[in-house]
Amino acid sequence: MCLSHLENMPLSHSRTQGAQRSSWKLWLFCSIVMLLFLCSFSWLIFIFLQLETAKEPCMAKFGPLPSKWQMASSEPPCVNKVSDWKLEILQNGLYLIYGQVAPNANYNDVAPFEVRLYKNKDMIQTLTNKSKIQNVGGTYELHVGDTIDLIFNSEHQVLKNNTYWGIILLANPQFIS
């Protein structure tokens, strides 16, 4: 065999070594990507498990007629009735406040039509349109001792047979401090 003939021969040995090297790098890259994906997915599951849904339904509703509080019996209770249109929060959590206010079209007193939703002493929503039925409420993070109050300028401004409001405990956050 002559030397020129050896120079033209393919060196298959070096090609397989390069192929093995690139296959090893690809395997390492895929493994790292999968590991990062699993870590991210596990972290998301951990975060969502921290926001625990309420175990028992905890809700309260006032009105329409008869105008009295209707409360779901849950242990421990999440709210306490303070007065007809006022509640005290007994459990930290994420709450849905909902309601409907029906204006009285026959109301002709000097006080302007205004319905206010308060959290403690802070007004969180105001309704002033007396021409149509309006919805009140939203989702709020509330803490033990907070009070929620629905106030009218005059009790005669609304039709009590079509006005109500309520609250539902959606979730108890269990965040680590």
From Swiss-Prot:
Residues exposed to the Extracellular side: 49-177
Glycan attachment residues as annotated in the record: 129, 161
Cytoplasmic side: 1-27
Transmembrane segments: 28-48
Domain THD: 47-170
Protein induction: Up-regulated after stimulation by bacterial lipopolysaccharides (LPS).
A molecular function GO annotation: tumor necrosis factor receptor superfamily binding
Keywords: Adaptive immunity, Cell membrane, Cytokine, Disulfide bond, Glycoprotein, Immunity, Membrane, Signal-anchor, Transmembrane, Transmembrane helix
Function noted in UniProt: Cytokine that binds to TNFRSF18/AITR/GITR. Regulates T-cell responses. Can function as costimulator and lower the threshold for T-cell activation and T-cell proliferation. Important for interactions between activated T-lymphocytes and endothelial cells. Mediates activation of NF-kappa-B. Triggers increased phosphorylation of STAT1 and up-regulates expression of VCAM1 and ICAM1. Promotes leukocyte adhesion to endothelial cells. Regulates migration of monocytes from the splenic reservoir to sites of inflammation.
UniProt similarity note: Belongs to the tumor necrosis factor family.
Annotated protein name in UniProt: Tumor necrosis factor ligand superfamily member 18
The species this protein was found in: Homo sapiens (Human)
Gene: TNFSF18
